[in-house]
From Swiss-Prot:
Gene Ontology biological process terms from the UniProt entry: glutaminyl-tRNAGln biosynthesis via transamidation; mitochondrial translation; regulation of translational fidelity
Protein biosynthesis among keywords: yes
Superkingdom in the source lineage: Eukaryota
NCBIfam families for the chain: gatC (TIGR00135)
Organism: Mus musculus (Mouse)
Enzyme Commission number(s): 6.3.5.-
Name used for this protein in its record: Glutamyl-tRNA(Gln) amidotransferase subunit C, mitochondrial
Transit pept. (range): 1-20
Function: Allows the formation of correctly charged Gln-tRNA(Gln) through the transamidation of misacylated Glu-tRNA(Gln) in the mitochondria. The reaction takes place in the presence of glutamine and ATP through an activated gamma-phospho-Glu-tRNA(Gln).
Family of the protein in this entry: Belongs to the GatC family.
């Protein structure tokens, strides 16, 4: 049942969201930026191409770099595949929560075997800041300068 609700939610138009930013119009009145504006569609109907404006929007939202034509082609193929999934009839299909739903899983008790091993675990990281792992956002790599900074746990 929840799969139908989720599919309806995912099929909502892209322009349904509203923004909290505001702009002043020529008369000096403030108008919400998201009201009355439409977000660009991912792929225009009947076309398999993604506009440069949408690519820039996705790069900003997802912190992913679509700098090459190959990356844009991969995005267009992924969108085409997702469009094929919309054609699948899932009426009457129970949602699957786990591939092991028909089996009884025996869980072990949650006991701490070894404590105070944070320093040992943080040694596995390339870069640590204030006892936290640092990872690059998306496929944008950390600057080379960051890798040269000594971590606080290395001695």
């Amino acid at each position: 049942m929840w799969s139908r609700a989720a599919s309806v939610r995912f099929r909502a138009p892209l322009d349904a969201g509203r923004s909290f930013a505001s702009k002043a119009n020529p008369q000096g009145k403030v108008q919400a930026a998201g009201l009355g504006t439409q977000a660009p569609r991912l792929v225009p109907q009947g076309s398999g191409r993604v506009s440069p404006a949408v690519i820039e929007h996705l790069e900003r939202l997802a912190l992913v770099n679509f700098g090459s034509r190959e990356a844009v082609d991969r995005l267009e193929k992924a969108i085409a595949f997702a469009d094929q999934l919309h054609a699948v009839d899932t009426d009457g299909v129970e949602p699957l929560e786990s591939v092991l739903e028909d089996r009884c899983l025996y869980l072990r008790s949650d006991n701490v075997a070894e404590g105070s091993c944070a320093e040992e675990l943080l040694q596995n990281s390339n870069h640590v800041v204030e006892e936290y792992f640092v990872a690059p956002p998306g496929n944008i790599s950390l600057p080379d300068m960051v890798n040269k900074i000594p971590s606080s746990t290395a001695e």
